[in-house]
């Protein structure tokens, strides 16, 4: 698929089949040149055959995965399952709930650090010792004789 076609599929609900037979259904958030896909609200469907039963009984196992990155190397087919959700500006207004968005207070005033994390108090204790003396600037190390 060309990138123009893939760009038109952004936010659509896709049905992606992989080499091992699994099917992933989710909303396309992103893709790259290697055909790696990022799907949100993804569900995985697997067809499982029962080993002990002689008849060809196959059942489908479904599990909710959430946000998934599918490697393009393993993708066999890609089909559109549904259109993108309604306008993003309307979608945000529908999801808001009661209350006011503000950070949760943790009981610590903003201007102060906790007691153990405050650091040393000025004027208490000794100063730091001086750094160790070096060899001097530009002088060769001991035992080295310039030519």
From Swiss-Prot:
Gene3D superfamilies: 2.30.30.100. PROSITE patterns: SM (PS52002). The keyword ATP-binding does not apply. Residues 1-84 form the Sm domain. CDD domains: Sm_B. It is found in: Nucleus; Cytoplasm. Residues 87-106, 128-147 are annotated as: Disordered. The keyword Nucleus applies. One of its GO terms (cellular component) is catalytic step 2 spliceosome. Keywords: Cytoplasm, mRNA processing, mRNA splicing, Nucleus, Ribonucleoprotein, RNA-binding, Spliceosome. One of its GO terms (molecular function) is snRNP binding. Pfam families: LSM. GO terms for biological process: mRNA 5'-splice site recognition; mRNA cis splicing, via spliceosome; mRNA splicing, via spliceosome. Belongs to the snRNP SmB/SmN family. Plays a role in pre-mRNA splicing as a core component of the spliceosomal U1, U2, U4 and U5 small nuclear ribonucleoproteins (snRNPs), the building blocks of the spliceosome. This is Small nuclear ribonucleoprotein-associated protein B.
């Amino acid at each position: 698929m060309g990138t123009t076609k893939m760009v038109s599929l952004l936010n659509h609900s896709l049905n992606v089949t992989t080499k091992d037979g699994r099917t992933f259904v989710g909303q396309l958030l992103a893709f790259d040149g290697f055909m790696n896909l990022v799907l949100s609200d993804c569900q995985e469907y697997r067809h499982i055959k029962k080993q002990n039963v002689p008849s060809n009984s196959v059942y489908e196992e479904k599990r909710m995965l959430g946000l998934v990155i599918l490697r393009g190397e393993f993708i066999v087919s890609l089909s559109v399952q549904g259109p993108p959700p309604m306008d993003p500006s309307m979608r945000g207004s529908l999801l808001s709930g009661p209350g006011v968005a503000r950070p949760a207070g943790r009981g610590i005033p903003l201007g102060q650090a906790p007691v153990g994390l405050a650091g040393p108090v000025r004027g208490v204790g000794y100063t730091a010792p001086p750094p160790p003396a070096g060899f001097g600037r530009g002088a060769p190390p001991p035992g080295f004789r310039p030519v």
